Amino acid sequence: IILAGGYSPLSVTVDFQTDMISMGKQAVEYHQFDKNFKFKDTDVVFFLTATGRALSHASKSLKEKGLCESHIVLMTQNIKYKNYDSICADDVVHVLGTFDGIEFNYQIMRLFDLIRIRYYTKYFI
């Protein structure tokens, strides 16, 4: 699991990362300053951006690092990205709201809690 996107929504995924790692699943945050980073076809990338700014700023450099080889789940409040061809997202989760960072972060926390709980019940119960 690779988490990428805006700094604010990424900060609320720290508990998710910690929990997934404690369950034996690698979960890392992508950092653009890591020049040797390459995405793999076995990666699941969650790209988090409320408005889409983080995506428009990073899309070219991410594609150069092989982003489109991965399975990409885009989570955004910006409805225009639901069918945006240049993203190469496999799935788009339209998070309800209108570019409200606090509301977006709470919904992201809830979505990642559900993913974590689903993973736990599937592999540990």
Q: What does each model-identified segment do?
A:
Residues 1-124:
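Glycine-rich phosphate-binding loops that contact phosphosugars or nucleotide phosphates
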